[in-house]
Swiss-Prot record:
Annotated stretches, region: G5: 174-176
Region ranges (G2): 60-64
Binding site for GTP: 19-26, 81-85, 136-139
PROSITE patterns attached to this UniProt entry: G_TR_1, G_TR_2
Organism: Paracidovorax citrulli (strain AAC00-1) (Acidovorax citrulli)
Protein name from the UniProt record: Elongation factor Tu
Residue segments, region G4: 136-139
Family: Belongs to the TRAFAC class translation factor GTPase superfamily. Classic translation factor GTPase family. EF-Tu/EF-1A subfamily.
Amino acid sequence: MAKGKFERTKPHVNVGTIGHVDHGKTTLTAAIATVLSAKFGGEAKKYDEIDAAPEEKARGITINTAHVEYETANRHYAHVDCPGHADYVKNMITGAAQMDGAILVCSAADGPMPQTREHILLARQVGVPYIIVFLNKCDMVDDEELLELVEMEVRELLDKYDFPGDDTPIVRGSAKLALEGDKGPLGEQAIDKLAEALDTYIPTPERAVDGAFLMPVEDVFSISGRGTVVTGRVERGIIKVGEEIEIVGIRDTQKTTCTGVEMFRKLLDQGQAGDNVGLLLRGTKREDVERGQVLCKPGSIKPHTHFTAEVYVLSKDEGGRHTPFFNNYRPQFYFRTTDVTGAIELPADKEMVMPGDNVSITVKLINPIAMEEGLRFAIREGGRTVGAGVVAKIIA
């Protein structure tokens, strides 16, 4: 039977596999793609194709990531899988692959291991909202009590990092059996169960266009007789002519009104997420707005200077620092379109941070930036990137 033309009518969700090395993340990724492509169309991927993940760059950092697509009855999924632990750390911190939910793969034969814990912590820190567990290699464990024990351990670990351990779906199976075509409860049926858990447990994400209007300021022009035009790419939401907006960050928050939306030199009624636009602002002077601020729906985002973050520090080979840094290190933090200087406070048990490390830090900026949890940034020194981070919690 010929496959019909691919039509994107189903809602789109981004997911990924996380978990300890050799617990079966890549095998599971291949198994999901293989089982679901047979039912709903799409492309089956072999283990080797996924394992040979191509290199990509995100915020100046090279990351190996494999991208796989598959469909269920209700949705279209884009799934990321990383070959190495360092790739996961970089991927999650840079947001190269934003995840609406993660599939935590844990081997029933081994139970939770150090990277199981670290990936759950990372998911919490970078704002992955939902985790589903696939208890893999269940064909290697005959003892029901042992399986229950491992499940309990995983639930406790999720609880520890503020995920709802008791309510988290845990699917038992064997990715290897499923990939080999086994139709039993640990094979194909387990993949079907996992697909059902993905469909029901991870809510459909809000589309960018449905969010509160936000546009980072890239450039500001003064047009004689017309006023001040601010250009940038709308990050989320919709801006309509005549709406009141706020200018947030760096200085005191100001209110203004959008009196015109321009795109490719044409006047429009509105601009929406993804559009590169110029917005005409009523009564705003050219010197009142600068790169690094944002235009937003009033009250939707506030300026902050003090926050905790999860950061990855580039290794020397990646073009990062050659030496460690210590408490009170003061680099530039690049948020959206501009650099702001800030001071880093290290955790009490950490004397220094080596290139190639990832670490939780506290930051105090010298100027406020429009900020919310989950916002990504780069750490720079003299214009070159030396790290990447994500805001975990706002303090002030």
